[in-house]
Amino acid sequence: MKILITGASGGIGFLTGLVLAQRGHYVIMTTHTKKQEVVLKEKISSLGYSNVVVEKLDITNSYDIEKFKKFDIDVLINHAGIGVGGSIIDLDIDSLRYNFEVNFFSSYNLAKIFLNNLISNNKSGRLIITSSIAGTIPFEFLGSYCSSKAAITMMARVLKDEIKYLDRNIKISVVEPGAYKTGFNEVMIDSANDSIEEDSPFFDKKEEIYDILKLKFSLASLHSLKSIVIQIVLAVEEDNKKFIYLSPFIQRMFKKIYALLKY
């Protein structure tokens, strides 16, 4: 299959692209910036992959979106995303909007373009959206990120049910990574800490909040990305109606327990 992955310059997106290429798929790995594109092209070239191409695709950029429309792909993995930290009370509206612009609206836009292309050309295909366990379980001072991921998961749920009416071979899946040591969560926690300024009602607790967030993610995070990459590969290749792909196992169990106890 011909697969496009957004946000593939590093971490989960990068490793997923390599594994899918190793399994014989043709993979388009995309990056947010031109600099990332150059670096990733060098990496791919050094690894000797002939079935991988690298493209710059800023999912918020209208020019790049026009370029995306020209790709003839079977699978879209909407992986690109950002994490904006900060209290709901403190966070400025522009930061919240930008978090949703990347994680929700831009992801929605790509999905809409991709699916309309499949439908108009009478093709089968798969849309895989990377959400997060944070879209189900709330994390204090990361409300913007949690909310954006909850929104994209719900959109995918509705989309999955709508597609059924078309009687097409189009599969919609959501991947929910738990905590992994990719650097993403660390940056988000730092941004949460930076957002607590002297005029914040949380300022006196700033150090305590930062330490608690770091401890939570330090205890929960896994170094190996293997478990979540396996789930994404399954979402690409499995012939079933499974919707949510979640890993690691311990956090999958925690999500189930939380669902039982939250009310």
Enumerate the language-model features and the residues they cover.
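Conserved glycine-rich cofactor-binding loop
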Residues: 9-10
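Conserved glycine-rich Rossmann-like NAD(P)H-binding loop of the short-chain dehydrogenase/reductase
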Residues: 23-38
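Substrate-binding pocket helix/loop in short-chain dehydrogenase/reductase
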Residues: 65, 87-88, 95-97
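Conserved NAD(P)H cofactor-binding loop of Rossmann-fold oxidoreductase domains
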Residues: 79-84
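Active-site helix of classical SDR
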Residues: 111, 148-151
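Residue(s) in the substrate-gating loop at a strand-loop-helix junction
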Residues: 132
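SDR active-site lid
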Residues: 165-240
